[in-house]
Amino acid sequence: MRKTVVAFAAAIAACSAVLSSTTTSAAPPATPITTLQADGTHLVDGYGRTVLLHGVNNVDKDAPYLPAGETLTPQDIDILVRHGFNTVRLGTSFDALMPQRGQIDEAYLDRLTGVVDALTARGMHVLLDNHQDGLSKAWGGNGFPEWAIESRPREWEPNPGFPLYYLMPSLNAGWDEVWGNTHGALDHLGTALGALAERVEGKPGVMGIELLNEPWPGSRFLSCFPNGCPDFDRTYQAAMQKLTDAVRAQNPTIPVYWEPNVTWNQMMPSNLFAPPVTPALTTADVVFAPHDYCIPSQLAIYLGLPQALRGLCVPQQDLTWSNIDAITERANVPTVITEFGDGDPTVLKNTLARADERFIGWQYWHFGAGNATDPFLGEVGRQLVRTYPQATAGEPGRMIFDADNGDFAYRFTPRAATRPTEIFVSDLHYPDGYAVQVDGGQVTSAPGARIVTVVADGSGPVTVKINRPGSAGAEVPDGPIETSSSGSSGSS
């Protein structure tokens, strides 16, 4: 059955703008938020729907952590909700959780859960990111409390700052302490993350805990080049399992997010979950959480190298995504890209197209607190703010979105769910409204709604197309969801 709805948006968009600026921040989401659990390579909500996450990072790296007046404001959250973002990767850290050996900072947990509650009240799924860069303040970094690491910079060592401080012998010695648990750093970190997990138990909007941001291999880093480091990854996987066990001892059902070691960002493959090199994954609700950065872009941003090198980003990111595909295939786990972009709009398409092809969610780096103006009104926002299925009452198929004109097409196969499919319609791409066409189902939302709801007519495939009035629209790509980078030019 074909249903067509045309939204006459001149009036509707104006009304929406007024409503978005006057509605109180306490307004609840239309569909109450539920926990997310892993189901094969997808995340599924409490209504039985497959969830796709589009969101941002918000990470406070420096003490005092999350002080009053410096957290996400109601206006910040309004911006995120208005643009259809449904997740925030919210930074926490070992140093914030346990500033003194063995002592959890309960006041900090109060502040952190206050931010969590403000986000989840608006329908945002929150990933708690145990963040670090450069290990500890001793090296000008952040993350681990200074009491947890005995190594210190030596007088003769120059400190080149991020990211080159990872080459400092003393910093590598500090990481060796972590992986060897020489002075109990992993034990104490497990206690801290366990306290965090216990505090957020029963909060359905918490989608999980990311155990450690961008873990560095320490003095074994050279062994990771040029083809990955199975010996270190064996040590690393054991450490992640240790932290997972500590978290699950306090909150048995909370999902945990594992990153690969950070040489992944330098194109090295991960050996996680790769028998016989490393153990097969047997723990439930583990989500793979890689980052997708373009090295030339990062070198231009942080070291001032020529921006023309960004032309190398496409083949580099193809390799990164082939490494993601390898993990997905062997471990059968969901993937969420928990960092990418770093303010560089020239590389956003590379990540977003590949994520769309694979029905993989993402969290953009970075969205700060206290925004006086909307940061998504430029080219970065035009890529990130997308029409997409936030929740699918069925098995997702192929999807495509054209960021230039807003043409969107999506196909899914229905299955039992207690709520309908929900598709967010970008508020940036349809200045004169949008048209919806559905084959195999029907629209149940009001004309011009920001969330289009769709129910299937039967058990056959459902195809949804959304575009500007008069546009020829997009066609759903043939075949199943991509599992390789061979078709990575589809969406933009």
From Swiss-Prot:
Gene3D superfamilies: Glycosidases (3.20.20.80), Golgi alpha-mannosidase II (2.60.40.1180). A lipid is attached at C15 (S-diacylglycerol cysteine). Its EC number is 3.2.1.123. GO terms for molecular function: endoglycosylceramidase activity. It catalyses: an oligoglycosyl-(1->4)-beta-D-glucosyl-(1<->1)-ceramide + H2O = an oligoglycosyl-(1->4)-D-glucose + an N-acyl-sphingoid base; a ganglioside GM3 + H2O = N-acetyl-alpha-neuraminosyl-(2->3)-beta-D-galactosyl-(1->4)-D-glucose + an N-acyl-sphingoid base; a ganglioside GM1 + H2O = beta-D-Gal-(1->3)-beta-D-GalNAc-(1->4)-[alpha-Neu5Ac-(2->3)]-beta-D-Gal-(1->4)-D-Glc + an N-acyl-sphingoid base; a ganglioside Fuc-GM1 + H2O = alpha-Fuc-(1->2)-beta-Gal-(1->3)-beta-GalNAc-(1->4)-[alpha-Neu5Ac-(2->3)]-beta-Gal-(1->4)-Glc + an N-acyl-sphingoid base. GO terms for biological process: galactosylceramide catabolic process; polysaccharide catabolic process. Its main location: secreted. PROSITE patterns: PROKAR_LIPOPROTEIN. It is a lipid-anchor. It comes from the Bacteria. One of its GO terms (cellular component) is membrane. Residues 467-492 are annotated as: Disordered. Residues 1-14 form the signal peptide. It is an enzyme of class 3 (hydrolase). Changing N265A: Severely decreases enzyme activity. InterPro entries: GH5_C, Glyco_hydro_5, Glyco_hydro_b, Glycoside_hydrolase_SF, Glycosphingolipid_Hydrolases. A lipid is attached at C15 (N-palmitoyl cysteine). Disulfide bonds join C224-C229, C294-C313. The keyword Metal-binding does not apply. It is found in: Secreted; Membrane. The active site is at E214 (proton donor), E339 (nucleophile). Hydrolyzes glycosphingolipids; exhibits broad substrate specificity including monosialodihexosylganglioside (GM3), monosialotetrahexosylganglioside (GM1), fucosyl-GM1, lactosylceramide, globotriosylceramide, globotetraosylceramide, ganglioside GD1a, and ganglioside GD1b. No activity towards glucosylceramide and galactosylceramide. Belongs to the glycosyl hydrolase 5 (cellulase A) family. This is Endoglycoceramidase I. It comes from Rhodococcus hoagii (strain 103S) (Rhodococcus equi).
